[in-house]
UniProtKB/Swiss-Prot annotation:
Family annotation (Pfam families): Ribosomal_S15
Function noted in UniProt: One of the primary rRNA binding proteins, it binds directly to 16S rRNA where it helps nucleate assembly of the platform of the 30S subunit by binding and bridging several RNA helices of the 16S rRNA. Forms an intersubunit bridge (bridge B4) with the 23S rRNA of the 50S subunit in the ribosome.
Organism: Wolbachia sp. subsp. Brugia malayi (strain TRS)
Biological processes annotated in GO: translation
Family membership noted in the UniProt record: Belongs to the universal ribosomal protein uS15 family.
Family annotation (CDD domains): Ribosomal_S15p_S13e (cd00353)
The protein's name in its UniProt record: Small ribosomal subunit protein uS15
InterPro entries in the cross-refs: Ribosomal_uS15 (IPR000589), Ribosomal_uS15_bac-type (IPR005290), uS15_NS1_RNA-bd_sf (IPR009068)
GO cellular component: cytosolic small ribosomal subunit
Amino acid sequence: MSITSEKKKNLINTYAIKEDDTGSSFVQCAILTERISNLTEHFKVHKHDHHSKRGLLILIGRRRKHLNYIKRKFGDEAYQQLIEKLGIRK
């Protein structure tokens, strides 16, 4: 369910704004999206894991807050590019 360090480094390199960027909202959204997709796969097998489902809802809310910040701070264009790149919305 957790992300490997190689996968996290790959996400940081892909979504970083500048070279040593590990904490921007873009990077955090990418990492949260990966964690959410891992938990979603977990729930396909373990349908009654309600404790982890609460954690999933917390992660989704945290990602939503970062996305709202990106939309407010950087504009709709950056927001749309990010959600298309992450594959969040349909």
